[in-house]
Amino acid sequence: LRILFIAPAPRAGTVQYTHNLANALVDRGHRVTLVTGVGFELADYPRKYTALEVFDRYRPRPLRLCRFVWHCLTFRPQIIHLQGAQHPALYILLWAMLRLLGSASFVYTPQDVLPNSLRSYHIRAFRFLYARMRHVFLNAKQNEPLVIEHFAVPRDRITVLPIADLTAFVREHVAGESPDIPAASRVVLCFGLIEPRKGIHTLLSAAPEVLRQVPDALLLIVGKPLMDIAPLQRQLADLGLQGRVRLVPQYVSFAQMAGYFTAARLLVLPYENGWNSGVLASAFGFGKPVIATRVGGFDEVVSDESTGLLVPPKDPAVLAQAIVRLLRDDALYARMVVNVRQAAAEISWETIARMTEARYGDVVGIGADCAVSQAR
């Protein structure tokens, strides 16, 4: 098949997901193009597909847009696969334009069911968009009833896919930069975009008890802020935990990410709500147990007492005890590391590509065995 992915954001989880899936689909005999934003963070990493940097949130790029249109006319995609939920108006505009250029079937992976910043028109826009998609891919079973209820998507047009390690290429191609951490520290890492729904304030509230029981613990909160972090900084100062809890409010490089994940003993995801997490999949890829809340489909990935611990959201006391337990119980931790590595090995991009390919075949009417012969 000839497949055109559109993932406008050039950085973070959605485009990393698309990069991995695109490579795996090429391995299965398909021809793939990824259209993304200017400043594509994976531009210098090995890839097997064509990448076009078209979108720019700061200024128009008419020449790049013309190249994109020309590529669509010459490539003649059979599948156009939209990725991400942050730009519904853009997706509708692209749908309206691209459907005039050929006969491609449109499919959609929202990643997040709703955007980080929900605006008044978004629900209507998504209803319009979903109604025009031939198939929808989700990354957590819990999201299926939400999409059916809010956007009237028929159940038989939905496929739930797992998420494999988004950043496996980091371990293959990047030398990690070790963070400045005291050698004896037991590092608890909370990684990813900093948003109100991520429950960072709950983690900070849990920190004093963790540090009381495990004096050599070090909590690292690393990620680009999508919120005002002044309240978090005040909370940290009021608790008097500077130096023992570090807030690193920036989007870090892949080398820095590798350093943080390697240094961590465990990952903690204290979300209050959500849809899925690429950070969780990356944690498993690095062999790290995860403490997560029972939201966002996390309980579909984390097996309680086996690959991590599940806790209720917004409960600092329970979160603190879970962190303490994994920091102090070395036997439990060792068992979990083994289980995490086994779980990570069972979810591959090849498997996800095969499942995706089967739905593509259904959509274009050529069945599941649609590689190679239809890609020419």
Predicted regions and their residues:
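Conserved donor-binding/catalytic core segment of Leloir-type glycosyltransferases
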Residues: 6, 180-198, 204-207, 220
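N-terminal strand-loop element at the rim of the active site
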Residues: 7-70, 143, 224-228
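Acidic anion/phosphate-binding donor-loop and adjacent secondary structure
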Residues: 30, 148-149, 162-181, 259, ...
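Nucleotide-activated donor-binding/catalytic signature segment of Leloir-type glycosyltransferases, i.e.
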Residues: 232-251, 255
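Acidic donor-binding loop of glycosyltransferase active sites
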Residues: 259-275, 288
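Short hydrophobic beta-strand element within catalytic cores of glycosyltransferases
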Residues: 289-292, 302
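Conserved acidic donor-binding segment of nucleotide-sugar-dependent glycosyltransferases
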Residues: 304-305, 309-316, 325-331
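A short, well-ordered alpha-helix in the C-terminal region of glycosyltransferases
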Residues: 318, 325, 332-346, 355-358
